[in-house]
A protein has these predicted regions:
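Histidine/acidic-residue-rich catalytic or RNA/ligand-binding cores of hydrolases
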Residues: 188-189
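ATP-dependent carboxylate/acyl-activation modules
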Residues: 1-175, 181-184, 194, 200-206
Length: 206
């Protein structure tokens, strides 16, 4: 963009000792009523590519670069099907060991409880009971939501949709894919705080 010449790496794609990850940038906060649930259609308005010594470092850098905030306060888990719950179980254990308070919707809370992971149960929005997910978000108790839908069918008024919209309106970090959520927790587990991330010049990656 600046008209400067950049030397091409001399290594092949299979010889690099670093990893590159691209993260999408979304603008759901500007789209009133839009469900921030990713499907096959293109929804991002841009992407950021970041490099790291391993996939966890590169992934965390890429997320932070598109405005994703690392959790400091509390995490809400609503992990969809029993298969998704099982796939996320070890990640939930890591979140607990990291000392992050875990909140969970009823079915997820029960699954965690059965596997000896402590969580605070919050009712779904459509249940209209207290304590509920929406009030916890409004009270500032949650700064990361992992909300994995049971299916990709779009319905105008579901508890999942209401949670995701509230998350977007409050600028809270959101993950809706179990693989992405697992990778994020692995990155958080191995790296810890964003202050541990190193910014290197391009020359160090040649």
């Amino acid at each position: 963009m600046l008209g400067e010449k950049v030397d091409c790496p001399s290594k092949s794609a299979f010889e690099f000792d670093f990893v590159g990850v691209k993260a999408p940038q979304f603008s759901f906060s500007r789209l009133k009523g839009a469900d921030p649930l990713l499907g096959v259609e293109m929804a991002s308005t841009g992407e950021v590519a970041c490099l790291g010594d391993n996939v966890e470092e590169a992934y965390l850098k890429a997320l932070i670069s598109v405005g994703f905030k690392l959790p400091k306060i509390g995490v809400l888990l609503s992990t969809g099907t029993i298969e998704s719950k099982a796939a996320f179980l070890e990640s939930a254990r890591k979140l607990e060991q990291l000392g992050l308070p875990i909140f969970a919707t009823p079915n997820t809370h029960l699954f965690l409880e059965q596997n000896d992971i402590h969580s605070t149960m919050l009712h779904q929005p459509l249940d209209k009971k207290s304590p509920g997910v929406i009030e916890a978000i409004e009270e500032g108790l949650i700064d990361l939501v992992i909300n994995v839908p049971r299916s990709l069918e779009r319905k105008d008024l579901t508890s999942g949709y209401l949670i995701r919209r509230k998350v977007v309106e409050y600028g809270i970090s959101l993950l809706t894919n179990i693989q992405a959520a697992n990778l994020f927790v692995d990155a958080l587990w191995s790296i810890g705080d964003e202050e541990e991330l190193l910014v290197k010049p391009w020359s160090e990656y040649n």
